[in-house]
From Swiss-Prot:
It comes from Arabidopsis thaliana (Mouse-ear cress). Belongs to the mitochondrial carrier (TC 2.A.29) family. Disruption phenotype: Reduced vegetative growth and reduced expression of ferritin. This is Protein MITOFERRINLIKE 1, chloroplastic. Residues 43-83 are annotated as: Disordered. Probably involved in iron transport into chloroplasts. InterPro entries: Mitochondrial_sb/sol_carrier, Mt_carrier_dom_sf. It holds the Pfam family Mito_carr. GO terms for cellular component: chloroplast; chloroplast envelope; chloroplast inner membrane; plastid. Its main location: plastid. Solcar repeats lie at residues 112-198, 206-288, 298-392. The gene is MFL1. Induction: Up-regulated by iron excess. It is found in: Plastid, Chloroplast inner membrane. Keywords: Chloroplast, Membrane, Plastid, Plastid inner membrane, Repeat, Transit peptide, Transmembrane, Transmembrane helix, Transport.
Amino acid sequence: MEARLSETLGLPSPNLNHCHFPNEFNSLFTHFSDLTSVQSPIVRNPKLKTKSSQKPPKFSANFRRSDPPFASTSISDPTHEKPGPEFLKWIKPASRSSPRIQTLIKQLSVWERAIIGAGAGGLAGAFTYVTLLPLDAIKTKLQTKGASQVYSNTFDAIVKTFQAKGILGFYSGVSAVIVGSTFSSAVYFGTCEFGKSLLSKFPDFPTVLIPPTAGAMGNIISSAIMVPKELITQRMQAGASGRSYQVLLKILEKDGILGLYAGYSATLLRNLPAGVLSYSSFEYLKAAVLEKTKQSHLEPLQSVCCGALAGAISASITTPLDVVKTRLMTQIHVEAVDKLGGAMYTGVAGTVKQILTEEGWVGFTRGMGPRVVHSACFSAIGYFAFETARLTILNEYLKRKEESEANVAADS
């Protein structure tokens, strides 16, 4: 029955190896798309033209002539005959399954991968930080010294912030966020991609240690840019008056360039474990998903889920470190100290001791709820944006590189 139907439609006889539905639906769909797109229906007997031989077979709404974006398979299977001009109009020239493209990907240098990662990271960082700035503002208000006397809970902090400054109160320091997050995220992801590519070239280096090592490298370098950005943003969220550049000038006037790095040690203390946990968790989850689905890259929903889980794990474990860092960064603001009262914090150890004395262990969990939500959302959006931007830049770069090499070959 199947053989007779295939002969009538001008298709090859069905291969039972492609019909293990639903586990191999992707393979079956790709194979079917290749055949219907590349090959024309063959008329077995020209004298007997039936409706079946005159019209192409109809497809249900669930079948499409091309794979959706981020699909695991590509219809440009090199095992099929060379497609014609009409086919080339709608297939992507930089299809990841092309042997030539795979060769170009393998030939990418460490620096090329780092630059692609930096470009994608900068775009993803700016988009993500601005999107989630309101959650970060509430988290900072709850973690500031004396916040328990001003805000009874998260909802109270939201209401009072809106009553005091309106919707703009949730976007204090947004200009510093855009500038700082773009550069810091570009440096972070660029360094991580550089580290992954470099460490992968050493066969004796344990594969399982590549993600955490690359994440640590990215955090150490990017923190030098991130700390001044966070300092200005959190000073404004804690009540400092003026615009971002005015707060920056006040810090430089009072404390010099070193004033921009108040809480740098606490930031590293938080960012290193948080960054290693988040980045490593995402890379491990990503590897597990790709291994299970046999895909070359994550689909959007998979990036969101892996990122959210990685962010939640990291935030819940590192909230105490974030509390210490926030106290050190915000307590220097004189107006806030005079308003809320209390002694100044002196270093990481002194801050930990003072929090234990005044608030007990509960003090280290301040703002955990908003922080976990913020981190899960941040990682979900951030890794999704990064993966999307990275694939877009990579495909465009490979396309241009392929065209350039083709032009050189044609000229020669």
